[in-house]
UniProtKB/Swiss-Prot annotation:
Species assigned in the record: Yersinia enterocolitica serotype O:8 / biotype 1B (strain NCTC 13174 / 8081)
GO molecular function list: carboxyl- or carbamoyltransferase activity; S-adenosyl-L-methionine binding
Gene name linked to the record: cmoA
Protein name (Swiss-Prot/TrEMBL): Carboxy-S-adenosyl-L-methionine synthase
Keywords, sorted A to Z: S-adenosyl-L-methionine, Transferase
Pfam families reported in the protein's UniProt record: Methyltransf_25 (PF13649)
InterPro entries per the UniProt record, alphabetical: CmoA (IPR005271), Methyltransf_25 (IPR041698), SAM-dependent_MTases_sf (IPR029063)
Amino acid sequence: MPKRETQSLHDTQQQPGPTAPQRDSLFAAPIAKLGDWTFDEKVAEVFPDMISRSVPGYSNIISMIGMLAERFVQPNSQIYDLGCSLGAATLSMRRNIKVEGCKIIAVDNSPAMIERCRRHIDAFRAETPVDVVESDILDIQLENASMVVLNFTLQFLEPADRQRLLNQVYQGLRPGGALVLSEKFNFEDNDVGELLFNMHHDFKRANGYSELEISQKRSMLENVMLTDSVETHKKRLHQAGFEHAEVWFQCFNFGSLIALKAGEAQ
């Protein structure tokens, strides 16, 4: 029987489904030939542990996405979680939606992530329905949206596709709607960038990752995860049409922006 959604948001991050997450040891031993990063079955299996030990402030962002949903989700609207992975942001939003007639659409292009996401969503009962969709987020037609989440997703798109996606998000939002855009940042000030890069590595070491694990994962990600500066993100958001865009959370070189579409909520 599905559980009622009564556990805390922090617990949802540690246990996003009916079983506890496995510890990430994917890169603990030397890998002879490192390919590019993919969100495959092995990554999906350890993803909750991996992201909590790798992304500073991740659990805070997830919790606060729920708080933002309570504030911004409008009655009879749709909410999109684009690049939903295992559904942590979806669960956080669903728990905090207080208005009627809403639906969350959670999208990811990884079959392994989608399969587990469906299990995690189905493990908890709630009033707000969720559609879990396996698709390229660029192919999703956004409509009647009051809130959209891109939680560490945009950085995995080809740079040439990023503006197009943000344009689609803006067009699909209702007046008064919000986009939450969480990303790893790079910095125009090289000294600050180096400091925060090193602090992030200290964070991973403190969470039990070895130098080998850190190095191998970085090598696999370097051609796949292409980061932007906060200034670049803001420029894109304003170009898409968002009247307001600002960082609302940051820890080291990771953070989240909120972008607002002007107008009165309907």
